[in-house]
């Protein structure tokens, strides 16, 4: 079964010939898991964008061993792809703050005339996972505040329309940043992508900031989603077929692609429904104070 790597190898059309889509977004949302600190400058340096295909030191990009072979295959496929030949990056930010329970990482991609701001999901640190659990009773968490700050700063330096997105917690950050960015930015944002990203507390969906940007959200989850069904979700969800099982479906490398799009399912798997119902019952029966304990 084909994957995002196959798509990067086989889809040769430019985004002008074949518009940017959910699969493209997931690819960029996967690349943000790489360590760009040795190649891409932070926002404060105001340096030029760097072409992705100029990077040849793969070991420096890979700071952890998870999915190492697949990550290298994706890097090579994107670098060799006519569709992504003009992919550039800038404004890399990577923050780990144990004291304030903050894990945040973002980068800005430019593909031809398109600007895509990608937020990283939870990494394998205790700080990252602790912040995820804090979302059950607290909003905003530090990473959400950083996402708004980052979007506001980057948009000040760049003109034109914006796309924002991320995988896992990165999808949640993309939505939250779009909700609370400057009002003019809300109209500049063309699309918001959440790939198996957790939802929000119920009251968020009733707020005006959410309602303003709700129609721009594209949320995708795998059939046995767990992370993407955490907390409440109001968006219309597109369910993607996966070639793995259980929690391993969360990995973007396992999502099935065919004919330049995801392969979609009509409903989530039984195990996903059970987990979703259990979490919903817990949220309905507890208060923020009790969840914090």
Name each model-derived stretch.
Residues 165-170, 174:
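Gly/Ala-rich beta-loop-alpha elbow adjacent to hydrolase catalytic centers
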Residues 1-20, 28, 33-40, 44-107, ...:
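Alpha/beta hydrolase fold serine-hydrolase catalytic domain that processes acyl esters and thioesters
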Residues 174-183:
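Short glycine-enriched nucleophile-adjacent loop
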